[in-house]
């Protein structure tokens, strides 16, 4: 029996020694791998072209998306401009062969819904934002969007004469609230102080209280995004909205608010309403595809025009050409710029005739014997931001 215990003790001792050796070797191996990874990471950091700071990467992506320049050029421009995005974009465009915008719209990481509705002589287009598509499709979220539509249509907002890049000068009297105005805290407070009306048409709280309730339930950053309201003052103004990627008739992922001016509107609608609605839908689909920043050259923000002209002029400053030739080159580039961002100057995207939108509108008026023009539009799309207008 003593002999059995002796062999058992010897076996256990040998096993413990072997296991200790194996663990020590594993520990040494893990430590070596860790050191290799650390050295590799340090080498990567030394050779990296740009900072890993999240904010810097967002700025870098933004500049690259607008200009389509290389990462190196965009990163260099951001450094030289102290991370000022607007100046960095200008810097890149002045120092590359192509000074034209690649895109005026960039992607942003936001989910939500766009909604629009007409009531009496008023029309509203708005967006409600959140962090996930799951919440955006929730019944309570959609109901809050509808309540927003109803209360903003039923209540006058004390904003005054505010103009947007999408306005036509002739529409100033009818213009109540611009899509870019919501950054004003007073307007936000005014909307959120309005009563919240539920599905049963009952009101027991304010819009702010209901918004906070939804935030607490879903644990997401739910907020009102862009907002536009247009009040019809001229009897010849035709109000129209178009929702793309619909959840239903009033709610979807993008939308257009459109105001047309048609002489003798009431009489025209008696016989040609369907034609006008279909044409308004076509114009709206063009706006969604082409993403213009203004109705006409005259209504484009003068700051945008001046800024673009300065960029073009700086890009041509090293060319040894007579002044008149340089001016012609500048005008040619400006014409190309206008054709990319001005609604009436754009090439119509719904057919292959290569007509300007302005010509398409004239042809429609001629074919239907009506005098028609575009006064105003707003365009909102979830996950998109216009770099010229916002």
Swiss-Prot record:
Species classification: Eukaryota, Sar, Alveolata, Apicomplexa, Aconoidasida
Organism: Plasmodium falciparum (isolate 3D7)
Keywords from the UniProt entry: Elongation factor, Mitochondrion, Protein biosynthesis
Family according to the record: Belongs to the EF-Ts family.
Function: Associates with the EF-Tu.GDP complex and induces the exchange of GDP to GTP. It remains bound to the aminoacyl-tRNA.EF-Tu.GTP complex up to the GTP hydrolysis stage on the ribosome.
The UniProt record lists the keyword Transferase: no
Protein name: Elongation factor Ts, mitochondrial
GO biological processes: mitochondrial translational elongation; translational elongation
HAMAP family membership: EF_Ts
One GO MF term attached to the UniProt entry: translation elongation factor activity
Localization of this protein: Mitochondrion
Additional information: This protein may be expected to contain an N-terminal transit peptide but none has been predicted.
Cellular-component GO terms for this entry: apicoplast; mitochondrion
CDD domains, alphabetized: UBA_EF-Ts (cd14275)
Pfam families hit by this protein: EF_TS
Keyword Lyase: no
